[in-house]
Amino acid sequence: MLLFIILSVGVDAISYIQNDRSNDLCIIYEMTSFGASFNNANDSLVKLHRHMGLKYEICKIESNANALTQMQKCNCLYDDTPQIVVFTNFRKSSLKTLIGTENKCELLPQTTIYTPTVDIESEYFIYGNDVKICYLDKNLLGIGCDATDTTSWLDLDAGLPTNHAIDIPEITSDGFKLFAKYGDSFLCQRLMDEPKKQIQFYAEVDNVPSNDVIESSRSWASVWKVVKTVLHFTYHILDLFYGNKRATARMIEHSPLG
């Protein structure tokens, strides 16, 4: 089961979503615009369900909003759905970091200096925007920062306008302090490099995102496969479901996707 727990700072309770539906696929669409091209692809999936019994759940992630908070509404990421397929046409996507591994994330307090409790043997990253850090080990980057004055702190994401994943490369026993300008930034601890579910990532040509920000492990799940359009991605879903490329040709020939 994919684990992505969101914790609120200062709150011990964890909420889990129960979902008894059984799906074949969890389909994630991250798009800059959900227009006619998405509607055509969605119509094709409806026909697949009607004619061939494909069971699926669709999760729509808007690229101009926080992907991590949107993921929490996607039940099939957390239930027993065996396979996840992801499509994006957003070049700055962080979905490979967020979905391709198992992570535990805590919401950072807004405009408040926060000192997290961290495990120096673990890997961490920030998912957010406009977050500053002050390392408490003076031998590290951030030497000279005033722990009480955030204007002297290092900007982790200077110049980037959207929420995204940012690696924290150095973790020592001295720890660090964080300051988040906005209320939807998270500190995430990587629990496992390999997901328990089967996951495949697809990106629209000319909009292939960068690699996982931590990249401590490289596997088939961390490779973006390139497709021409979102409709071509739908054809790949058919191949994945039936395990036979000739199935796509038969479906196109008989026009249930058209």
Curated annotation (Swiss-Prot):
Q: Where mainly located?
A: virion
- GO CC annotations on file: host cell rough endoplasmic reticulum membrane; membrane; T=13 icosahedral viral capsid; viral outer capsid
Q: Tell whether Zinc-finger is among the UniProt keywords.
A: no
Q: Where in the cell is it found?
A: Virion; Host rough endoplasmic reticulum membrane
Lineage top rank: taxon: Viruses
- Please give, as recorded in its UniProt entry, the membrane topology of this protein: Single-pass membrane protein
Has the keyword DNA-binding been applied to this entry?
no
| Sugar-bearing residue positions | N42
The record's section on Pfam families has:
Rotavirus_VP7 (PF05868)
**Could you tell me the keywords of this UniProt record?**
Calcium, Capsid protein, Glycoprotein, Host endoplasmic reticulum, Host membrane, Membrane, Outer capsid protein, T=13 icosahedral capsid protein, Transmembrane, Transmembrane helix, Virion
- Residue ranges of the TM segments: 1-13
| Family under the similarity heading | Belongs to the rotavirus VP7 family.
What the protein does? Outer capsid protein involved in attachment and possibly entry into the host epithelial cell. It is subsequently lost, together with VP4, following virus entry into the host cell. The outer layer contains 780 copies of VP7, grouped as 260 trimers. Rotavirus attachment and entry into the host cell probably involves multiple sequential contacts between the outer capsid proteins VP4 and VP7, and the cell receptors.
- Describe its partners and assembly state: Homotrimer; in the presence of calcium. Acquisition of the capsid outer layer requires a high calcium concentration inside the endoplasmic reticulum. Following cell entry, the low calcium concentration in the cytoplasm is probably responsible for the solubilization of the outer layer.
> What is the designated name of this protein?
Outer capsid glycoprotein VP7
Q: Which organism is it from?
A: Rotavirus X (isolate RVX/Human/Bangladesh/NADRV-B219/2002/GXP[X])
